[in-house]
């Protein structure tokens, strides 16, 4: 170890006891002379040069935080051995906080802190120091870096990241079960003293919970804590620094602990016996009532399953578990009958669906109760002995024959008499009827299987004492067949025979049908009504027969048509038969037997249109003619609707003003000057569209200028109409251009007038009322005038 290193260790050891003293001055130790080969090199003048190596022996200062003194806090002192004390050197400080937070005395090198420092904001500051010549401003020492470390004091209390914690733990947990861990932080320096050493303790929540001092883990402290007794707990935890010693700072937090539910409670019925009532008329599936077992647990731990385990009504009732309400709904399983049984007893069991094996020791998680269901009597409708009836009857029975009987009874204990009726909507033809007292069904009209083989009837049974109580039943009547119809030709046969036919030639194969339906099937026999020399019938014994010729050759000019009666009979009892006539035409044929032409009568219809087609064509023509005539008549009767139906019907209607045509023939152009006539505007005209009710003095309107426009003219007339006291109290058409009826005069000249003033009739003035009598006398004249 060199002497230089030894001196550095010595200075460090000497300063250790004084680290906490802020007034301690750190001075630069005298330079240590280390001679090297270069430093001992001789000068040119023969003298040996000695270079002195200088170094700062300090590299850090220590400063306590949160200084509360009134003066600047002393940090330390910088000093160079070049400083002679004459003020020739100047100390300069730079780096973190230099000049603001830390200042240096330029002459003495003393460093001070200008304000209080918080270590939690910044733990150390790095600065640089340099000594320069005040006159030359040249450094006498190289710039050196040092650190000011801030010593921590216990000025921060522990804090929790959350003011309130929320935690949960299952109820009935064992002692020591971990609930939650809370952790507090301290901003003080954990490496210096006990300022940041936190100890946890519980202030509130004992004796239910405890906390580990070092870790902050909260654990249960009591066994078998029951949620049903108390569900919420509030625990206050304290975190204290300085290892929990007196004088340490502390912080608290609140932990809300909830006991979560476990299935530790069995379901319980609140009553040992439950009474329910149900009407006997309730259909299957009707809810009778509900039972519910209470469970102190919650959620799935309280889910209950209900079932009927015993009783005399297990076949009549069922129970369904309602998941939403946790109720057992008892429903009707089979139809009930008050007269048969009036009381049922059920034993219902409720059991938890989720059982925790840890709590088997608490007992069975099930409970039972007795449910008694009383059946209430209602006035029931009659009950038929069958759900439906089927009667079979032959179609040839006489009217009034009983075909069957329906039976019904009143299920009530009163046994009210029953009245039977037939729903006529199911028997519109009134073929059947029923005896109202005993339900005997009989015919009222003859039956015909060929018209209807089945009849679907509805019989109504009603109580006589209470006709509203009715029941319906279906009665199916099947009509059995009787051989009452003779067989007939299946189709109409158009048969012909060739003139060159030979004996035994087949000309037609015939068949028959019968409306009857015998049990053994149809069997027909064919024969001729009488022996025929021209044709014969050969029965094929398969319900068909062949028509054969018996002679050689036919002549259509002699006989054009033959009528062959054929007898068709069946084999049922009684035997029915009919005679069908087969029309055979004689036609000319080729060598192959193909028909070429027949008689004139036979060829008439095929050559032209049929009678039905001709009738249809004539009807179409007649219908078209009728349509044309009706259309023409409607066109003649159509009239043009008038613009205004009457003078009274002019309110709120559109009025056309251009219905005077195009003017007189001698008019060359429209002259707006006629509307600019001041005299016409100023003239106060009487309205003649209505009868005046009062006389009033005409008012003279101000003289309008000559340049009056059409708009001003219309506005003046509108104002005049609004101020007219004789105007009706509704909007009406005011006709100012009224010129009266057509004049009887042939000319405007008085010389050419065909009438005199005396011929004018002013009698209408008398119809205006007494107020216009004077005017009527002036113009109408009196009786004396007439006599004169």
Curated annotation (Swiss-Prot):
Record InterPro entries: Cadherin, Cadherin-like_dom, Cadherin-like_sf, Cadherin_CS, Cadherin_Y-type_LIR, Catenin-bd_sf
Extracellular side: 23-613
Gene Ontology cellular component annotations, sorted alphabetically: GABA-ergic synapse; glutamatergic synapse; postsynaptic specialization membrane; presynaptic active zone membrane; synapse
Glycosylation sites: 256, 456, 534
Propeptide, chain numbering: 23-54
Keyword Ribosomal protein: no
Membrane topology label: Single-pass type I membrane protein
Job of this protein: Cadherins are calcium-dependent cell adhesion proteins. They preferentially interact with themselves in a homophilic manner in connecting cells; cadherins may thus contribute to the sorting of heterogeneous cell types.
SMART domains per UniProt: CA (SM00112)
Alphabetically ordered keywords of this record: Calcium, Cell adhesion, Cell membrane, Cleavage on pair of basic residues, Glycoprotein, Membrane, Metal-binding, Phosphoprotein, Repeat, Signal, Transmembrane, Transmembrane helix
An example Gene Ontology biological process: synaptic membrane adhesion
Record bears the keyword Nuclease: no
Record-given protein name: Cadherin-10
């Amino acid at each position: 170890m060199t002497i230089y290193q030894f001196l550095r260790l010595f200075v460090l050891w000497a300063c250790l006891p004084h680290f906490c003293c802020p007034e301690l001055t750190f001075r630069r130790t005298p330079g240590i002379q280390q001679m090297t080969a270069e430093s001992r090199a001789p000068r040119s003048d023969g003298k040996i040069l000695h270079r002195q190596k200088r170094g700062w022996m300090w590299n850090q200062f220590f400063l306590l935080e949160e200084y509360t003194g009134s003066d600047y806090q002393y940090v330390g002192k910088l000093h160079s051995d070049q400083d002679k004390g004459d003020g020739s050197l100047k100390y300069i400080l730079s780096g973190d906080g230099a000049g603001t937070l830390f200042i240096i005395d330029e002459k003495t090198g003393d460093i001070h802190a200008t304000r209080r420092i918080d270590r939690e904001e910044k733990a150390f500051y790095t600065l640089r120091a340099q000594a320069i010549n005040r006159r030359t401003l040249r450094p006498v020492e190289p710039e050196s870096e040092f650190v000011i470390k801030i010593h921590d004091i216990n000025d921060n209390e522990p804090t929790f990241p959350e003011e309130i914690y929320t935690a949960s733990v299952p109820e009935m947990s064992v002692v020591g079960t971990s609930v939650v861990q809370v952790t507090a932080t301290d901003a003080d320096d954990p490496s210096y003293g006990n300022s940041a050493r936190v100890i946890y303790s519980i202030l509130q929540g004992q004796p239910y919970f405890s906390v580990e001092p070092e870790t902050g883990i909260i654990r249960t402290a009591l066994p078998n804590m029951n949620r049903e007794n108390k569900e919420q707990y509030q625990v206050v935890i304290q975190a204290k620094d300085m290892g929990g010693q007196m004088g340490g700072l502390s912080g608290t937090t609140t932990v809300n602990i909830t006991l979560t539910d476990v299935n530790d409670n069995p379901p319980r019925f609140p009553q040992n016996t439950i009474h329910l009532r149900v009407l006997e008329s309730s259909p299957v599936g009707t809810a009778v009532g509900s039972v519910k077992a209470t469970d102190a647990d919650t959620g799935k731990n309280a889910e209950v399953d209900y079932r009927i385990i015993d009783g005399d009504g297990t076949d009549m009732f069922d129970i369904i578990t309602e998941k939403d309400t946790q109720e057992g709904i008892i429903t009707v399983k089979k139809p009930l009958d008050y007269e048969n049984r009036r009381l049922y007893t059920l034993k219902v069991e409720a059991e938890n669906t989720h059982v925790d094996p840890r709590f088997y020791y608490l007992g069975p998680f099930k409970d039972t109760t007795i449910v008694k269901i009383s059946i209430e009597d209602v006035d029931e409708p009659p009950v038929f002995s069958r759900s439906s009836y089927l009667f079979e009857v032959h179609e040839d029975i006489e009217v009034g024959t009983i075909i069957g009987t329906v039976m019904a009874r009143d299920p009530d204990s009163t046994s009210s008499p029953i009245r039977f009726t037939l729903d006529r909507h199911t028997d519109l033809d009134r073929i059947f009827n029923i005896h109202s007292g005993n339900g005997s069904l009989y015919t009222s009209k003859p039956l015909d299987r060929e018209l209807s083989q089945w009849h679907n009837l509805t019989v109504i049974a009603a109580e006589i004492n209470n006709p509203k109580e009715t029941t319906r039943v279906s009665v199916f009547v099947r009509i059995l067949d009787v051989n009452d119809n003779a067989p007939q030709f299946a189709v109409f046969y158009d048969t012909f025979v060739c003139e060159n036919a030979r004996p035994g030639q087949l000309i037609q194969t015939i068949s028959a049908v019968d409306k009857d339906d015998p049990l053994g099937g149809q069997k027909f026999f064919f024969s001729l009504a009488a022996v025929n020399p021209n044709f014969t019938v050969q029965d094929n014994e398969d319900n068909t027969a062949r028509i054969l010729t018996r002679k050689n050759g036919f002549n259509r000019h002699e006989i054009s048509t033959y009528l062959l009666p054929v007898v068709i009979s069946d084999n049922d009892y009684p035997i029915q038969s009919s005679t069908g006539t087969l029309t055979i035409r004689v036609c000319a044929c080729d060598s192959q037997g193909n028909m070429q032409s027949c008689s004139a009568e036979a060829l008439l219809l095929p050559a032209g249109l049929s009678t039905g087609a001709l009738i249809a064509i004539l009807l179409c023509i007649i219908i078209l003619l009728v349509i044309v005539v009706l259309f023409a008549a409607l066109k003649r009767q159509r009239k043009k609707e008038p613009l205004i139906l009457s003078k009274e019907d002019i309110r709120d209607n559109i009025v056309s003003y251009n219905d005077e045509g195009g003017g007189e023939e001698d008019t060359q152009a429209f002259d707006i000057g006629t509307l600019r006539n001041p005299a016409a505007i100023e003239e106060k005209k009487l309205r003649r569209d209505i009868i005046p009710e009062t006389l009033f003095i005409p008012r003279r309107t101000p003289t309008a200028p000559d340049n009056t426009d059409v708009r001003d003219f219309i506005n003046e007339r509108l104002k005049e109409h609004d101020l007219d006291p004789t105007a009706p109290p509704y909007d009406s058409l005011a006709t100012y251009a009224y010129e009266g009826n057509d004049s009887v005069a042939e000319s405007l000249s008085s010389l050419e007038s065909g009438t005199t003033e005396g011929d004018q009739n002013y009698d209408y003035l008398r119809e205006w009322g007494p107020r216009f009598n004077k005017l009527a006398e002036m113009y109408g004249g009196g009786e004396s005038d007439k006599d004169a």
